[in-house]
Amino acid sequence: MRALVVFAHPSGDSLSHTLFRTATMALAGAGHEVVGLDLYAEGFRAAMSADERRSYHLDDAAAELARHAELVRWADALVFVYPTWWMGLPAIMKGWLERVLVPGVAFHLHPRTQKVVSDLRHIRRVVGITTYGSSWTQVKVMHDAGRRTLLRALRMLCARRCRTAWLALYSVDTSTDDQRAAFVTSVERRLARL
């Protein structure tokens, strides 16, 4: 399997960064080809420019995003590692989805019906790895926007039998060192079996 691991957290000493390293190493250790994208380290710009928006339906990624678009085309598994902030994806991760998964990369419009036709049918796995400051109950009440974005909206564009996984640590701010270590271990084991 070819896995693209997309990571969003500004701090190199964060639990999220540990999860990113763990995910990439576990996948590689299981024999998968792995490419990691550290959006903050790359200086990825979250906001779509006016020029990008004007050319949105020209079926081509902006030149600065060509490498990211090619990696999406290359991958058959997408893994997202990030902290949940304000009950959703960090702005940089949401920006990556909006700027990279554009017409010509993620989908195109049928010429006659103008309905969305997927260009991500090669994606067989979507995995989300995240931490929440809130409890499971609070996240459920707020409808878990990040999970819905990745496992529903993105999943709809993927292969018909695309499998998904959601690996989450809730109440991370009050979790113990042992709970965080156990979560890292569970992520490692789960991805080693992907």
Predicted regions: what they are:
Residues L39, T131, L169-S171:
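Active-site donor-binding loop signature of nucleotide-sugar glycosyltransferases
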Residues P103-H108, R160-T164:
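Short, structured loop/turn "capping" segments at alpha-beta junctions
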Residues H108-M156:
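Short, glycine-/small-residue-rich phosphate/pyrophosphate-handling segment
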Residues T137-V141, A145-L194:
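Glycine-rich phosphate/pyrophosphate-binding loop and the adjoining helix
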